[in-house]
Amino acid sequence: MLEDKNKNLLFNIAAHTGSLIAVIIYFKKEIFSIINNIPLLQNIIIATTPVVIFGFMIKVLNINLFLQDIKIVAYATIFFSIILYFCDKVSVKIKFNKNISNRNALYIGLAQVLALIPGTSRSGITISCARYLGFSRLDSAKFSFLISIPTLFAATVLGIGEVALNFDRDLIILLLVGFSFSLIVSLLSIKVFLSFVEKHSLTIFVIIRLILGFLLLFYLAN
């Protein structure tokens, strides 16, 4: 049982690492520009800090098992889909010029904390918040991806710490496959998603998540 748990955790780490590298590769220009743009770096830190603090608290208090209740997943999926729909209706008021305000960064960071609730999409809730604040869909998505870098990095490091003592060398090939698959899929997903939101609304994602949420409720009812 413990061995299976370690295998799953290792595979999740490989997948997280692949996603992390994909975001870094795709946004390498923005990342390198941070060297000359301290305000952007500051805002990324501000937006990331809340989820790190609350994530640590959830782990210490051991309430993550309670949050994994499938009913919570279903209701969160439906509820935050509705939030995304209405937030996406807000007109663009703010131009993201690589220097959003600290207050807006904090709001988006607090919204990201809600992603700790299973069924809540991290990108979905942060984009919802950014759209509500008046950012365009494309700018909202870009900032959401940028603040995912510290989060993915932290998740990877914590995961490695948990399985380091029980690492199985026989799983290296499987982990490389998982990493490579995650990297390729993530790169394609980022490119397709950003191209889509630049020209279209987020309604299709709302519909997909609503369907998934109601399917889960239907499954529970039967």
State where each predicted segment sits.
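Multi-pass membrane proteins that catalyze or facilitate reactions on polyprenyl-/lipid-phosphate substrates
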Residues: 1-222
